[in-house]
């Protein structure tokens, strides 16, 4: 049955959702965290998942709002799994520049469908250079199955996870082998773009991104996010390099108190100059990630037959799931990283 033939979702309550609700969620006190390798930083990933809840129609909103703290806190679990699981790291990126030469269009060269890409490059090659668009498609199918089973644990786990991968796909530096500027003398740009700029400026962004919409072609949606990110990559690198020429080293970097330690970081002045010259890019990519996350949750639910989630409300995550998450957190803090690090 096509989406158009499904019953229309009642949006009236959604439309009555006042701006006050979103302002309340933005007043949530986020601890400033610097992850070792997380796209958007832990701060950004949590905010993306949290605000995505407010894009949902009434049929999903009640359930997701009830579990908004879980979805927020566990938005970073996929990055933690990079410390615990082989095969996780490549789910977070795709090095498009390994597939094309200057002047070529990677999006006409790389097949979008997994089987066609495997036939052209081999699975080992794809895994080596990252699989994020295909993994988003896999995660959507897992979430859809969780809705079909009406399994609260799996709905929550896969909702949090897919939000993370979608967030990663909206980051330009997750589409290149030069993911941390290490090939162009710009080491550290990864954390600058996705963490430092967000932590300084996120409270000034406009998060009224509209309502979640059904995604007709999930794989194409994932690829479109990657394409938009990659199209911005040249500006990310070029503008930082140009700006560096205007700042003496002692003006580009500074030291800040982080907990009990004093750590080096990009200065506030350099960060703000970079953010300004990017001309809203970080905010645009974050807004696009938020609406895509909400739309993907909605799409998985629709494709599962629109199960009545009100029947699942007041059902907390199981102790088994919470124990699994605590074990993952312990492995993360123990810290044997499996995959690339962006410091």
Language-model segments: what does each one mean?
Residues 8, 49, 170, 174:
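Alpha-helical and His/Cys-centered functional microenvironments
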Residues 167-181:
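Catalytic Zn2+-binding segment of zinc metalloproteases
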């Amino acid at each position: 049955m096509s989406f158009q033939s499904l019953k229309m979702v009642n949006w009236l309550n959604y439309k009555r959702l006042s701006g006050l609700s979103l302002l309340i969620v933005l007043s949530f006190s986020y601890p400033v965290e610097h992850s070792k390798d997380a796209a958007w930083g832990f701060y950004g990933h949590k905010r993306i998942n949290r605000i995505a809840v407010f894009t949902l129609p009434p049929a999903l909103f009640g359930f997701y709002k009830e579990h908004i703290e879980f979805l927020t806190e566990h938005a970073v679990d996929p990055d933690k799994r990079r410390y615990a699981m082989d095969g996780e790291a490549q789910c977070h990126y795709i090095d498009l520049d390994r597939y094309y030469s200057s002047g070529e269009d990677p999006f006409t060269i790389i097949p979008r469908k997994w089987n066609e890409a495997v036939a052209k490059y081999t699975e080992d090659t794809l895994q080596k250079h990252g699989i994020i668009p295909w993994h988003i498609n896999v995660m959507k199918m897992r979430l859809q199955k969780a809705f079909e089973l009406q399994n609260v644990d799996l709905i929550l786990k896969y909702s949090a996870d897919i939000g993370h991968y979608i967030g990663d796909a909206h980051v330009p530096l997750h589409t290149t082998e030069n993911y941390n500027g290490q090939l162009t003398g710009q080491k550290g740009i990864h954390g600058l773009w996705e963490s430092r700029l967000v932590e300084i400026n996120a409270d000034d962004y406009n998060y009224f991104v509209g309502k979640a919409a059904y995604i007709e072609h999930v794989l194409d949606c994932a690829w479109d996010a990657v394409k938009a990110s990659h199209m911005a990559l040249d500006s990310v690198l070029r503008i930082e390099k140009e700006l560096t020429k205007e700042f003496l080293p002692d003006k580009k970097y500074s030291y800040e108190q982080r907990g009990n330690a004093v750590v080096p970081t990009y200065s506030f002045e350099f960060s703000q100059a970079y953010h300004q010259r990017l001309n809203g890019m970080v905010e645009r990519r974050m807004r696009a990630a938020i609406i895509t996350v909400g739309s993907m949750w909605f799409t998985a639910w629709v494709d599962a037959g629109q199960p009545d989630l009100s029947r699942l409300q007041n059902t907390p995550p199981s102790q088994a799931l919470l124990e699994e998450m605590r074990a993952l957190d312990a492995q993360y803090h123990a810290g044997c990283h499996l995959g690339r690090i962006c410091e």
